[in-house]
């Protein structure tokens, strides 16, 4: 079969395991351990299925207005998508062109970024992280000949975090005509969003998801906040690919979830508290734990390979995530679950290591 040479060169993103062979405690894909808002459940129980014979609103006006209300923006500053991965994909296609230089992102970050670059033919440079696995803002600023910047904040898979002051410094010292994309998938677990910086920085884009802090990974809903010019570019890409990417159900669930801010604040505060307690407990056991502002921790123990930690826990029915990259191969990423989940995990870690 004759296939495109482009396909033969691609190295697809590898998601976290979703095994079916047994029942695991899943702490490997950063899913929220709590259910969605009770209001979402009520909507689904009373769903008017007749609405599904009609196409969704391709502009997602009500959802975009709702997002705008939450973050102090108007709907023209909001773009919605089938999960934040789709939003990121559209951003890469619409904004980054190797004719304007290489795209920059940290060497340790969300592993979908180089996949998008290969898919769209975008040249890129990975910027080394610090010894503490932090994002080196100064190194980004030095490379003004690049076509743009992309980084997750908090970073994935490390959980390390740039303050609003750090991001402002970067924006003020990087060419204003070049896009700066901040992936804020985990920002609701203790970080401070860069939304206030959108007003004065027209090259800034913030990508968000309903999967993590809003417990809706199975729905697939993401969004971008940026100036109108950048949002219009994303709409052009969307309408050239699929003018109806976000379903009627997804749009309505997103609207309802946004109406129950107090519920989500409550459960995410629980996750933050468990994260801090679990990190402290690991530290007392001699584990290295990176400071995290996400719903996971990145941890390792001297003398124990990360792969071994992953395998031994899997044998005990607990899934965590291991990455093979050189600087992080001695770590594992552990999603924060319920207090009971983390007690079970901690007990196994005491026994095994």
Protein language model regions, located:
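Conserved PLP-anchoring active-site segment centered on the Schiff-base-forming lysine
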Residues: 94-116
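N-terminal "arm"/small-domain region of PLP-dependent enzymes with the aminotransferase-like
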Residues: 1-54, 145
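Active-site phosphate-binding strand-loop segment of PLP-dependent enzymes
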Residues: 125, 130-188
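PLP-dependent enzyme catalytic core of the Aspartate aminotransferase-like
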Residues: 165, 312-316, 321, 325-353
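Short acidic capping loops at alpha-helix termini that bridge into adjacent secondary structure
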Residues: 74-78, 101-102, 177, 184, ...
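Phosphate-binding glycine-rich loop
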Residues: 62-102
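Conserved PLP-binding catalytic core of the aspartate aminotransferase-like
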Residues: 272, 284-316
């Amino acid at each position: 079969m004759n296939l495109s040479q482009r396909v033969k060169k691609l190295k697809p993103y590898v998601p976290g395991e979703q095994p079916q062979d047994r029942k695991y405690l899943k702490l490997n894909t950063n899913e929220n351990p709590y259910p969605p808002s009770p209001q979402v459940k009520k909507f689904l129980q009373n769903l008017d299925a007749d609405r599904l014979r009609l196409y969704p609103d391709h502009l997602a006006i009500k959802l975009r207005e709702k997002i705008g209300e939450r973050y102090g923006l108007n709907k023209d500053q909001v773009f919605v998508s089938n999960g934040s991965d789709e939003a990121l994909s559209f951003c890469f296609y619409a904004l980054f062109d190797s004719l304007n230089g290489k795209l920059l992102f940290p060497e340790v970050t969300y592993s979908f970024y180089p996949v998008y670059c290969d898919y769209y033919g975008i040249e890129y440079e990975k910027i080394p992280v610090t010894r503490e696995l932090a994002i080196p803002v100064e190194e980004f600023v030095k490379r003004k000949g690049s076509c743009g910047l992309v980084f997750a904040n908090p970073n994935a898979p490390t959980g390390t975090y740039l303050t609003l002051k750090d991001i402002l410094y970067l924006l003020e010292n990087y060419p204003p005509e070049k896009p700066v994309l901040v992936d804020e998938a985990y920002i609701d677990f203790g970080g401070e969003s860069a939304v206030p910086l959108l007003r004065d920085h027209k090259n800034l884009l913030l990508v968000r998801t309903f999967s993590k802090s809003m417990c809706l990974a199975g729905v697939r809903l993401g969004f971008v906040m940026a100036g109108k010019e950048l949002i219009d570019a994303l709409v052009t890409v969307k309408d050239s690919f699929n003018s109806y990417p976000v379903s009627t159900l997804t749009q309505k669930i997103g609207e309802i979830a946004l109406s129950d801010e107090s519920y989500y604040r409550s459960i995410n505060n629980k996750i933050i508290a468990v994260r801090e307690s679990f990190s402290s407990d690991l530290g007392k056991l001699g584990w290295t734990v990176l400071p995290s502002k996400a719903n996971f921790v990145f941890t390792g123990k001297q003398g124990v390979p990360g792969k071994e930690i992953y395998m031994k826990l899997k044998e005990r029915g607990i899934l965590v995530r291991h990455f093979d990259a050189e600087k992080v191969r001695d770590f594992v990423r552990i999603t924060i679950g319920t207090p009971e989940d983390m007690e079970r995990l901690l007990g196994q870690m005491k026994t095994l290591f």
